[in-house]
């Protein structure tokens, strides 16, 4: 395919793109060792900007990664594989030396359709495990909060009635004591549910980095039982969408603050005129990442539509290095999650 690719500053990334393709996200990921490179891509019928993250995995060996990009909506299904291969080939000369593969986490395109694309050519390979969730639930906010609540299922309505009598939700105002109290709850949740927790430094970076607060901001919503913090969620806001990223809560018999936290975030997203609330993370197509099934029941209780996307896909620049990296990566994924079946694997993103 004919395309023209130029390096640009990360500040020139399109503000209309998903937050994962923004200068804000490049700054966040810098705190976990990824360096952001921005590009403009011009084709015959479209043009877009692209964020590529690069991380050194070993001496002289780096992985390049495109989070939720490039856009595919204007392509025919038969063109997607060729487009991804051509983009990887042409962008290689603009990436640092030593990059052994380009990893795509493609955007969500399919509404309630589990027949997603996979790829297996000499150099383009769909992976057994994905970096980011392959399924999500999105709620249309365009008609306002009251209209959204009409779509809540009875499970959510019952849980909210109980939670409203026991908990209060407030926005974190930036004080360290409240953040640390929530982080303790987060660590307890990680131990209980068996996931790998993010560091305090990384989670702070989500809330501190915002070069233009009118475009991308994140908020920590805290749930209180009296004066005690018993839960909280981090939600990322942009002009087009709000995305639930991280959450934690203590367990109570017959009651949960998680429903009240999500309802508060949905209300806040409506007040900010976001078009979509993304609950971010349910099992993928055809039973992939089935360990997220419990989350699907919770997230779909707020209504919305499930969306699916293709699994993570790598373009191989150096096949020998890639095979070595994939072996150790698979071992790490399974050991961190105690996963025996490859179909249930989903690493911490």
Predicted regions and their residues:
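Non-catalytic accessory segments adjacent to catalytic cores
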Residues: 78-133
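Acidic-and-aromatic substrate-binding clefts and catalytic sites of carbohydrate-active enzymes
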Residues: 74-77, 108-112, 285-291
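Aromatic (often tryptophan-rich) hydrophobic motifs at membrane interfaces
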Residues: 85-90, 206-319, 323
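Flexible glycine-rich active-site/ligand-binding loops centered on an Asp-His dyad
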Residues: 66
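Active-site/acyl-donor-binding loops of N-acyltransferases
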Residues: 2, 14, 27-28, 58, ...
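A short, internal acetyl-CoA/4′-phosphopantetheine-binding micro-motif in the GNAT/acyltransferase core
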Residues: 69-79, 142-143, 247-255, 283
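A conserved beta-strand-loop-helix scaffold within acyl/acetyltransferase catalytic domains
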Residues: 2-60, 106-111, 120-254
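Short, high-confidence coil segments that cap the C-terminus of an alpha-helix
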Residues: 34-36, 96-99, 216, 271-274
């Amino acid at each position: 395919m004919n395309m023209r690719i130029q390096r640009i500053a990360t500040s020139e990334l399109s503000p209309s793109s998903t937050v994962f393709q923004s200068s804000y996200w490049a700054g966040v990921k810098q705190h976990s060792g990824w360096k952001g490179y921005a590009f403009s891509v011009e084709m015959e019928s479209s043009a877009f900007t692209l964020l590529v993250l690069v991380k050194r995995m070993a001496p002289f060996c780096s992985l390049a990664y495109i989070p939720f990009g490039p856009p595919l909506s204007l392509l025919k299904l038969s063109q997607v594989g060729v487009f991804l291969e051509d983009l990887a080939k042409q962008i290689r000369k603009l990436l640092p030396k030593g990059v052994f593969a380009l990893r795509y986490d493609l955007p969500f395109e399919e509404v309630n359709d589990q027949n997603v694309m996979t790829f297996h050519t000499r150099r383009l390979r769909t992976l057994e495990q994905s970096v980011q969730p392959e399924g999500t639930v999105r709620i249309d906010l365009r008609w306002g909060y009251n209209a959204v609540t009409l779509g809540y299922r009875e499970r959510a309505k019952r849980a909210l009635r109980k939670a409203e009598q026991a908990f209060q939700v407030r926005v974190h105002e930036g004080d360290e004591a409240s953040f640390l109290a929530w982080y303790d709850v987060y660590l307890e949740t990680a131990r209980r549910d068996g996931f790998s927790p993010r560091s305090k430094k990384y989670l702070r970076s989500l809330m501190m980095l915002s070069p233009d607060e009118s475009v991308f901001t994140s908020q920590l919503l805290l749930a209180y039982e009296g004066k005690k913090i018993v839960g909280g969620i981090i939600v990322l806001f942009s002009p087009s969408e709000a995305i639930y990223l991280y959450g934690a809560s203590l367990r109570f018999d017959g009651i949960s603050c998680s429903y009240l936290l999500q309802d508060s975030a949905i209300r806040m997203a409506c007040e900010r005129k976001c078009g979509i609330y993304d609950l971010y993370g349910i099992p993928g197509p055809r039973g992939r990442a089935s360990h997220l099934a419990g989350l699907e029941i919770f997230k779909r209780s707020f209504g919305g539509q499930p969306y699916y996307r293709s699994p993570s896909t790598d373009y191989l620049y150096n096949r020998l290095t890639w095979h070595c990296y994939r072996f150790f990566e698979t071992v790490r994924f399974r050991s961190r999650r105690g996963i025996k079946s490859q179909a249930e694997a989903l690493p911490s993103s």
